[in-house]
Structures are given as structure tokens and as C-alpha cells.
A protein has these predicted regions:
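Conserved helicase NTPase motor core
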Residues: 1-83, 98-102
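Helical mechanochemical/support elements of P-loop NTPase systems and associated helical scaffolds
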Residues: 5, 13, 59, 77-80, ...
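P-loop NTPase Walker
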Residues: 25, 108-111, 340
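Short glycine-/polar-rich loops that comprise or flank the Walker A/P-loop
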Residues: 56-59, 65-67, 88-92, 129-133, ...
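A short beta-strand-to-loop transition that corresponds to the Sensor-1 phosphate-sensing loop
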Residues: 64-67, 74-76, 98-100, 110-111, ...
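Helicase P-loop NTPase motor core
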Residues: 89-92, 97-187, 212-213, 245-250, ...
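Conserved helicase C-terminal RecA-like lobe
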Residues: 175, 179-181, 185, 200-374
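A short glycine-rich beta-strand->turn/loop micro-motif centered on a GG-aromatic cluster
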Residues: 189-201
Length: 377
């Protein structure tokens, strides 16, 4: 279909460097030092390409964490990271064992999970004043969703920003019950990877109206002008009482209003409308304060002060089709990535039965590795 993906680009580049010495020499002459981040996630093709770029030199720096190798299904292998000192005997190895993100209890849990695994470090937290982990056992999936939603609502009521809360899960379908429970509690949320903000019809219309006003030469301070346009499209002074499409529409219009409020002094309506169109094209989505729902894979590289990890039962995490030792180890690393997304508070939960209440479940082996202390239903 005359289309190529990222892997095709890598293969094409590798083939060109192998076939065209002139191009290879130019690349090696152009770049003197190579720095590779997330080195535990490189694939064989990427490793071969890196070796072609570097050549016989040793001017290379790699950064990685073998405990965060969670893309083996895409060809990633931590072996390149672990074997690096053997391939470069003169390499200076710096172990980054101080964790500046997570509290002491979270780091201790992470160490328990990865103890004895290849390349695992024994981390030390720089934050000694940390809240203990909270573990909860729910009767069924619906009860687990209600627990998470209720606890999130309590945290928000106590002053925690919704943007500082994330709920992480092994697979996306686990969010369905949770979304309903959050709506029942009146808690705004965003599903990471869901439909883009600027794809919403009411947002497209609002951007079009703002652009039209700018082209027509409407004068005045930016925020009042934008507010007038948004009020004309249904933005009220008060949020709708109930969750649903009307509330979602209101929050999207508020997000546009917030963009106008955050604009630098002196920004014109035309400049603002141009910025909106640029963000629409690039998919840079604003949002009002909302709890993030995400799979652990999608959450990698991010962090939140408060993290809930749900579905921590055998067959869910580790997932049911993880049968081999290597597959279980990948699930273990994924669990490690999940718990280390939390900075201050970490909530771990599972349900004893499924939604229909028919299939009993056992707690995840990863949860059991952390010891006792779960709250009972």
C-alpha cells in the first residue's frame, strides 16, 4: 500500500548504511558522541543500527533500567544493557540507586518485587517521610471500582488535585466499571489514549467560532471575548449537576476558556485562534482537572503523587496468557513500573470474584510478595 512504519525506516536506514560506505562515513564524521536513553528497550535492529553509527569508537553513553524492560513483545531486550560492560571493557558504570521520585514505602515494595532479578538494583528513597501503602480486597469487580472511586473522591475533597491521581491497570477494558463508578462520585476523569479533545464536535465548532471572530476583526481583551463566544455555545456559569455528555461538553468548553486565561498578556484573538488550530493539528489536548485512567504500558515515563493499581489478582496481573517463566518475568517488571509511577501514595487492590461473582480469584503473586496488611471487604 506504499506505506512504511517505524521498523521499516530502521531497516531501510540499516540497509543503506551497510550498502553505502560513503553515507556511513558521513554519519560517523557528523556525530562524535552517542547518548542512548531507555537502553533496556532497544531491539536487535536498533542495536545493530547503533553499532553501525558508532563504529570502532567508544564514544557512547547508555542509560537504562533492566527492571523496566516491558516491550519484549516488540523485540526489546535488556541483554544489550546488561552485557554493555563486557562489550566495552573500559566503560565507567554508574549505578543510580537513589530514587528521587517515590516515597520510602514505595521504593521498599519495588525492591521486594525485583529482588534477585537480573540487573535489579537495590534502590534507596530520598524521601523518608512517606505514607504507607494501602491494600484493599474487594468482594467483586464492581465493589473494587466503587472503592477506588470513593477513595479518589475523598482525596479530592481533602485538597488533592484530580490531576495528581492516576488509576493504572493491566488492560484497557478494566476501566469500564471504574468510569461508571467515578461518574457516580462526580469525579472527572480522562482515559489515556481515548478520543482526542479536538476531535469532539463541540470543540471543533468552538475553535471555528473563535477563528471566525478573529478573522472578522472582533476587538477586546482575549479572555472576555473568548468567554462570550463559549457562553454563546452553551457554557454556563455553573457546571451541570449530573455527569454524562452534557457535563463532558461543559468541561471541554471550560478547558478552552482556561487556555485563554493562561495566554500571555497581549495575545490577540487571531494569535490565540492560530495557536488552537496548531494544537488541533498536533493533537496537543488540554483538559480540566481529571483523574487519569491508564494501562501500565501507557503510563511508563509518567508519574503522579497518588496512584491506584487495580486488578491485582492471578489471571489479571500477571495476565492469564503469561505462562512461561520469561512471560511472568515481563509481568513482574510491568508491575514494578506500575508501582514506581507513584510519588507519595500507592493503593493496591484486587477483587475476590469477577463482575458476575462466579469465578473466585487469588491475589497476585506480586501482591503476595509485599506481605500482609490488605484491608478486607
Amino acid at each position: 500500500h506504499n506505506r512504511i512504519d517505524f521498523e521499516d525506516v530502521l531497516l531501510g536506514m540499516l540497509g543503506m548504511l551497510e550498502a553505502e560506505k560513503r553515507v556511513l562515513d558521513q554519519v560517523r564524521a557528523q556525530y562524535s558522541v552517542f547518548v542512548v536513553d531507555e537502553y533496556q528497550d532497544v531491539s536487535p535492529v536498533q542495536q545493530k543500527l547503533l553499532e553501525m553509527w558508532v563504529g570502532p569508537r567508544e564514544d557512547i553513553v547508555v542509560v537504562g533500567d533492566a527492571s523496566q524492560t516491558i516491550y519484549t513483545f516488540a523485540g526489546a531486550s535488556s541483554s544489550y544493557l546488561l552485557d554493555f560492560p563486557n562489550r566495552y571493557p573500559g566503560a565507567h558504570v554508574i549505578k543510580l540507586e537513589t530514587n528521587y521520585r517515590s516515597g520510602e514505602h514505595i521504593v521498599t515494595a519495588a525492591n521486594h518485587v525485583m529482588a534477585g532479578r537480573p540487573g535489579a538494583l537495590t534502590l534507596v528513597s530520598s524521601n523518608r517521610d512517606a505514607t504507607p501503602l494501602r491494600r484493599h480486597v474487594a468482594l467483586d469487580d464492581a465493589a473494587e471500582a466503587r472503592y477506588v472511586a470513593g477513595t479518589a473522591a475523598e482525596l479530592i475533597a481533602s485538597g488533592v488535585s484530580p490531576d495528581d491521581i492516576a488509576v493504572l491497570m493491566r488492560f484497557g477494558a478494566q476501566s469500564l466499571l471504574l468510569e461508571n463508578a467515578l461518574r457516580d462520585q462526580g469525579v472527572s476523569h480522562r482515559v489515556q489514549g481515548a478520543a482526542a479533545f479536538f476531535d469532539e464536535p463541540h470543540v471543533k465548532r468552538a475553535v471555528m467560532e473563535i477563528r471566525g471572530a478573529a478573522v472578522a476583526g472582533v476587538q477586546g481583551e482575549l479572555l472576555p471575548v473568548v468567554q462570550d463566544i463559549l457562553f454563546g455555545l452553551g457554557l454556563g456559569a455553573e457546571a451541570p449537576e449530573h455527569q454524562g455528555a452534557e457535563r463532558a461538553r461543559y468541561e471541554d468548553l471550560v478547558a478552552l476558556q482556561e487556555l485563554a486565561a493562561q495566554a500571555a498578556p497581549g495575545v490577540t484573538l487571531l494569535e490565540f485562534s492560530t495557536m488552537l488550530q496548531r494544537r488541533m493539528e498536533t493533537g496537543d489536548n488540554p483538559s480540566v482537572g481529571a483523574v487519569t485512567l491508564s494501562t501500565v504500558h501507557a503510563a511508563k515515563g509518567q508519574e503522579w503523587p497518588v496512584v491506584f493499581m487495580i486488578g491485582l489478582a492471578e489471571g489479571q496481573f500477571p495476565i492469564s496468557y503469561a505462562k512461561t517463566e520469561d512471560a511472568i518475568d515481563e509481568e513482574r517488571r510491568l508491575f514494578y513500573v506500575g508501582i514506581t509511577r507513584a510519588r507519595e501514595r500507592l493503593f493496591l487492590s484486587y477483587a475476590q470474584k469477577n463482575r458476575e461473582g462466579q469465578q473466585p480469584r487469588e491475589p497476585s503473586r506480586f501482591l503476595r510478595a509485599l506481605g500482609e496488611g490488605a484491608e478486607k471487604p
